[in-house]
Amino acid sequence: MEPFPRILDDRLPRNMRRPRPIDKMPMRKIVMLGANARTQRSVSSIQLPAEYSPSASSAPYFNYSPDDFILDLRSHQSDEIYENGNSNHEKDEKKALKELLHERWENAKQYNAFNYPLNCMYRCLDGKYDLSMQLNIERGELRRKPMHFKNIKEPFNHLRFNFAKLHDHEILFYLKCDTDPISNDLLDRHLVAVNASPLERDHSLIVPSVNKCSPQVLTLQAVRIAVDLMLLVDDDMFHILFNSLLGQASVNHLHLHAMYWPYDSDLINRKCEPLHDVPNVYVIRPPVWICPAIVFQLDSLDNYEQFKMNIYKCVEHLTESNQAHNLFLARAQPIRTTGAEKEEDRRGERPQLVTCYVFPRMNMIGAKPPSNFNPAANELAGNLTSYTIRFFESANEQSVIRIIEEEASLDDDTFRSLCFDLADVLIGRSVGTSRPQDLDTLAGLTSPEIDELRDSFQSFMPRSPSIRHRSSTRAQSDEGSK
């Protein structure tokens, strides 16, 4: 039987037609970007990270605008009480952020997003600084093993853990500012995710531009997100923290911590001093507080841009100087430069303004070992976490300060020199212009070299507060015996 004439082939049903040459060709396998670390190059001019999938997450967006910002938490609470008592005022978008964070964080529990259930104990330490301490044994035992770092500006390494590898149920929501975009890049995704080893309820991670896979170096964009969230959450227990590499950071992928702490840090009640000739920038140092810090406060939304830029310039200088640092953002009363060292607002009458404390600190080379507690941003603000029941029960203010002095606090001369340099940076002068001559002689020396230089001229005196106290007591008794 002769085959069908070719002219009739197109008239047959599709399933009876003879295969054409193109149909015989094998289908080329399509490799999804992110399915394999050795993924094929995309035809797009923009190459996303291998692990990143922008459409995979079902997490919602939180949209906000500067109109939602709360400058003074105290006056906002008064206005809210009035509105609730006189009208059916709709809940603000800014209040929805707090509710969304809590709702999504609680919802993540059903997916086993956390390494352990929260079951923490607290105690307040007697002493000058009103330190509070949490017992969190599970965090010390079950958290991800900290990574080893040698430099503050280590490049991002996609082979190590990073937040592009988060599961969908770990992403709480994305951030988007409607009127003033956080980034000009439409592919940027700024997310808030669970912290799998939390300190407190709603403890989360803020990851700016997760698709960019930036190292743990604070950017102006990250500062902006931190300030915005502080202005959006109407709760004085809410804080945002940042730890640099060599300053207790565990992951080299740009992130900040968002969390609540059930006790006020006494840091917000302390007197400061001006940072030389720089307006609206302050310094706090021992003995007013347990460790030195640079302080910034947003007292008007007109100063919003300058506030962000000052924080960024400060951190940028520390990063370029390879100086480890921690940031602690809180709601604090207006900064005082006169009066008593400590003044509490017991009546709740003073404004509560967004305040940023930048703690320059000693560099800690290598992975942080498991110990009684690790002095990071929250600890330097007086909010301590103990990983052992023994230390939790036996710790006192002096033992805590001793650990902070030995592992974090800069010595007086180093901090003084840093303050002069920061004043030059913030004013726009050449760095070193305002530094006194006596500090110039120590420039370029490492901390051990400076200590050796001091030891050659004076007897060694341990920095322990308890030993210092015993020494002064012994000296007084010697004078009395004479």
Curated annotation (Swiss-Prot):
**What GO biological process, any one, is recorded here?**
glucose metabolic process
Q: What is its main location?
A: cytoplasm
What Enzyme Commission number(s) does the record list for this chain?
2.7.7.78
Q: Which domain of life is it from?
A: Eukaryota
* Regions that span the bilayer: none
Q: Which reaction does it catalyse?
A: GDP-alpha-D-glucose + phosphate = alpha-D-glucose 1-phosphate + GDP + H(+)
Keyword Transferase present in the record's keywords: the answer is: yes
Q: Where is this region: Disordered?
A: 1-21, 461-482
Q: Where is the signal peptide?
A: none
Catalytic residues, per the record, are 255 (tele-gmp-histidine intermediate)
Tell me the tissue specificity. Answer: Expressed throughout the neuronal system, in the spermatheca and anterior hypodermal cells.
Q: What is a single cellular component term in the Gene Ontology annotation?
A: cytoplasm
The record describes the protein's role as: Specific and highly efficient GDP-D-glucose phosphorylase regulating the levels of GDP-D-glucose in cells.
Miscellaneous: The orthologs in A.thaliana are GDP-L-galactose phosphorylases catalyzing the first reaction of the Smirnoff-Wheeler pathway, the major route to ascorbate biosynthesis in plants.
The family line of this record is: Belongs to the GDPGP1 family.
The protein here is known as GDP-D-glucose phosphorylase 1
Q: What species was this sequence derived from?
A: Caenorhabditis elegans
Kindly list the organism's lineage: Eukaryota, Metazoa, Ecdysozoa, Nematoda, Chromadorea
Gene that this sequence comes from: mcp-1
